[in-house]
A protein has these predicted regions:
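Rhodanese-like catalytic fold shared by cysteine-dependent sulfurtransferases
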Residues: 1-50, 57-99, 107-157
């Protein structure tokens, strides 16, 4: 009989560090966001904010797209929104842009918006409840899904 190898306990100095859970990360991310309900998100967009739909293509095809949103899937988000990155979208003009991130249910968008804030994009936030809440509120959705924007030329890691 063999004994399973145990993983080393993460330490900070002499103290053991309990690894964070995904719920801990979500609470921390949301603590720095001025999250918007769908109606407030629409008002923000009408006032100049940029709405980003980070849902994967299969979800957009199944449910439709948010009218007027830029489609940037989650794995490209930071590169597209960082105004210093050669792979940025045209809307990424400076660090003062208000980015409103929308995923399907409002979970990954919170983590994504916090990541944008870590890049110095302090006005980044997300939609409470995501696309599901947007659609339930009767806000504009396009069907069938429109094609994604082509990616700008430039390097991408």
């Amino acid at each position: 009989m063999t004994r399973a190898a145990s993983r080393p306990v993460p330490r900070r100095g002499n103290q053991a560090v309990v690894p964070a859970t995904v719920d801990d990360l979500l609470i921390e991310a949301r603590g720095g966001l001025a999250r918007l309900d769908p109606a407030a998100a629409l008002r923000a967009v009408r006032g100049g904010a940029v709405l980003i739909d980070t849902r994967p293509q299969w979800q957009r095809r199944a449910g439709g797209e948010i009218a007027g949103a830029i489609v940037i899937e989650r794995n490209h988000l930071e590169w597209r929104c960082d105004p210093r990155c050669p792979a940025r979208v045209a809307e990424a003009t400076d660090h003062q842009v208000t980015w409103v991130v929308c995923c399907d249910e409002g979970y990954s968008s919170s983590l994504a918006a916090a990541s944008l804030q870590a890049l110095g994009l302090s006005n980044a936030t997300d939609v409470i409840g995501g696309f599901q809440a947007w659609r339930a509120a009767g806000l504009p959705v396009t069907r069938p899904a429109t094609p994604s924007r082509p990616r700008p030329a430039g390097p991408h890691p």
